[in-house]
Amino acid sequence: MVAVVQADYSRAEALAAWTRLSDEFIGNCYVSVRPRHAPAWEVVVASAAGSLRLEAFKRAHDHDFLDRLAVAIGNWEQKAQRPDHEIAQMLDQVGDYGLMQGMTNPDKGFMHADILLPLLQARDACAIVVRTEPVFQQLGTAFLVRPDLILTAAHVVMDVDAATGRWASTLKNGLAFHFREKPNQREHPTLAIRPAAVALISHALPHGRPPNLLERSLAAPADTCLDYALIRLAQRVSHLRPVEVVDTAAVKQGKPCWAFGFPGGNALMMDVDLVTDIDPGSGRWLHRANVAAGMSGGCCINHEGQVAGLHEGTLDSEDDAKVKRNRGISIAAIRRDQCRDGKDPLKQVASSPSLEFRDPALVDGWYRAGTALAGEAGAAQWRASVEAALRGRNPDATDSLPAYHPWFARADVEKWIDSAAPDERLSLIHGPPGVGKSFCIHLLRGKLDPYADLVVFNPTQTNDMTWSDATGHAAAANASDYRTAAASVRYRAIDDFLGELRDRSAGGTRTCYVAIDFGPAGRQDRFVGTNWVELIAILAAAGWIRVMLIGLDDYERSVMIDRMESRPETDSVKIAESELAPITAAEFRTYAKHLASARGKPAPKQAEMAKYVDSAVVGVAEPMKMVAAVRAAIELEAALS
């Protein structure tokens, strides 16, 4: 290593020289200095960028090193015992979709690493827009701006008045939006979600004539021809993160602009090039990023990593027909148009239901929970019923499990997450075995950003660790089966933990959630008489932290409530209690109708619905009712698909 550093290279060349070292040599160096609880790789990339790294990336690119580096990092992290699913996510982020290449392309400008994450998020938020009737047709691209709202170009989705041949203010029939089934997925988008019954929330008709004959002038009346459509989905997309919409985001002439979309196929394309012209009056700009038919309606990201607008179309240059220019529509102009009547559609309460999670690991957890609840006597029968619901696939083989898992509404819990009063900072979740208490953590994950907004303590940590060890373990976001013997509590650990939470919540300016799952009834001394009580009170006293406690029994809850009411710093904190019960037959019927609507299918007929309800609710003994309802929903979703 010394010889490499002393060689006559520039700073970037010195780092590029590492590309000639063996993987084993670099790996030993890497592992030797890697912290035991290294932060998430995405956080490192977003926070540790600088000019030296960018120069090194360029040199590494010259040596075709980037793909080899991705594989090498995966090998090193595997040796360091990082979970396989995290390694797969890392490889997706550094080795696919051209993101790293766009980051290092010297001809089109460097992407600062601080905007790598916004680009990854924009990639995941994009959907293919298709029409399924009268014949299947791919129309363009759209992107999530809220879990239940999607933004696209109006000319992609708006119908044409047959009498006049002009654009109509109605959506085309048979629309569907194809999303990824999970973040950072290599596979092409396959999850089709339909528009809601009342779908068109706001829009402005296109600037030009159908099908998309754009007027050549950059300038256009901004109040009537912005060519956008904001559409409500039949269900919320809970497994993907929407892009963050900043009303003032804008492009800058001479700075790079990234364009995303699906060019006539199901593979996402991303390219970057410079902005050449801007016309604020029309809410449009021109850029040179390489785009193609099918990318209309996709999002455009500016040089600061913000959504600057959407891609409208391609124009020939007025002075040279061989020179292509691409036109974008400003998000600032779109947002002004959306809010012109004083109402902001992005801030209105979502009316679309959350219907599903997309996570095979969650399905595996459900199957294993059912096995535990069934006990030794009922395990074989439970396995057979799950295998039948999976249409003969082996439920013990995790690679054969579906991604779909139902999201059954928990109104009180979701209301606390979405709209609790400022002083309602403690939620107590309880109920009999098998009603899905621990599943409420997945509701939190589905609504929040786990990296910034949520810290979870699992039953292993609450039952087998001192709270000081558990806080450090949870803050490191490490989900391994770590165990520790009982040890004396270090009170200073709470200061470290609060500091970690404050960092996650932007200095306490955004709400941070802490979910503590005490699991099934455990030792009598697991909670009462321990420092968990004091820790929870300290967290709830912080005005920017909300705490969800899961699985405490009646006596444990009374102890917690007495502690909160006995101190001046916590006596004003309101406590929300939710006693969960299994899903009812009426709730399952409502869920089934919503799911069918989201899949673009008619609701099951009465006899067919009765079959699913019987499987989910009728004749199912406690404590198997909730896991049986999930099984029935999985069977229903497979039939609808």
Curated annotation (Swiss-Prot):
InterPro entries: P-loop_NTPase, Peptidase_S1_PA, Peptidase_S1_PA_chymotrypsin. GO terms for molecular function: serine-type peptidase activity. Keywords: Antiviral defense, Cell inner membrane, Cell membrane, Hydrolase, Membrane, Protease, Serine protease, Transmembrane, Transmembrane helix. It is found in: Cell inner membrane. Its EC number is 3.4.21.-. Belongs to the peptidase S1 family. This is Probable serine protease FE772_23065. It comes from Lysobacter enzymogenes.
